[in-house]
């Protein structure tokens, strides 16, 4: 779990997301509260439940990007799901319990990686011994068994030194490696993914752990042997329990597009993919026990962050019980021209940096001037105002159109310097931006 302070979390998010300080502060506080709760004594810790968040804002302002970046910072089980993928229990489609199953799978994978990393040093030693056994087979006794020698031979020590220095990396050896389990692919009908995954694991376990000889270069064999030895050092049952604990205490679920499951007007018949999904989400958010293939998971202390554009529906269109379980409301603001300018220049891997790097592979040096950046931002904002407002995503559309000619002719422009200033942008975009009908289809 991340031990970063709220200020550090916001600072890290600022490297990738422009503006939306309120949303950043809310998720930073929520993430820090996970750590604070774990410092309490056990009795009080059980009573402190997470304050779930509802992020409201137009499309393309950074809701999903905040979730993506938060996943990397959290160092905790994290899953992002689309609310529109689910239907009410009993109907064709995914049921909401699969959110917790997927979160548990993600936790098992995360904990396994951490456990393997923790045992890597010991695994490297064991892998080294196995390679040395192939290079210098140990002496055998009268019964054909390898003798345990008290001290490694001088030749073995010499080869160990060469192996560590990388002198033997390109030498080819034949070594026994664990064979891949029998592959059985079962296509799951909607809603039955859990049953099919259990069937798959059953078929994979039928073959047992077989080994087969493979010819590999030593550097490639070393990587595979380290992974194999590290996996042997991990206790699967302990790993599952650690993963379930991580989900229950630190798990975070991000539900995107929650506004799309709001009830719209008076409809007749069951509303299985809207209000039905909201009703099914209630026990998950409130706290219940979900059965997974790794064990039973309690959802009482899992943090839920929901987000939606709410352009057609309103937050009040959610059923009252679900509104009550999302107590913290954060409104994200629509982006302005100055925000667009900052998006083009400030993030670590901004769109302009990406284009410059892509063109540099062809030997073309692209330079964006301040006036060019300003004109691109104005063009994107203008198209958003006159057509549909899709936020920062409009910058991708505008830049792709602007760079189209350079991208197409890049191989013929090797060694050239191209400056993209206000004049260049106006020449390539003004006609499209001014013609509302054209910009509707092209930008």
Swiss-Prot record:
The keyword ATP-binding is assigned to this record: yes
Q: In which residues is ATP bound? A: 18, 60-65, 256, 321, 393
Q: According to the record, what induces this protein's expression?
A: By heat shock.
GO terms (BP aspect)? protein unfolding; proteolysis involved in protein catabolic process
Which subcellular locations apply to this protein?
Answer: Cytoplasm
Disulphide bridges: none
Which CDD domains does the protein's record reference? RecA-like_HslU (cd19498)
Keywords assigned: ATP-binding, Chaperone, Cytoplasm, Nucleotide-binding, Stress response
**Predominant place of localization:** cytoplasm
Q: Which family does it belong to?
A: Belongs to the ClpX chaperone family. HslU subfamily.
Q: Which HAMAP family match?
A: HslU
Summarize the subunit comment.
A double ring-shaped homohexamer of HslV is capped on each side by a ring-shaped HslU homohexamer. The assembly of the HslU/HslV complex is dependent on binding of ATP.
Q: Under which name does UniProt file this protein?
A: ATP-dependent protease ATPase subunit HslU
Species for this entry: Salmonella typhimurium (strain LT2 / SGSC1412 / ATCC 700720)
Q: Gene of origin?
A: hslU
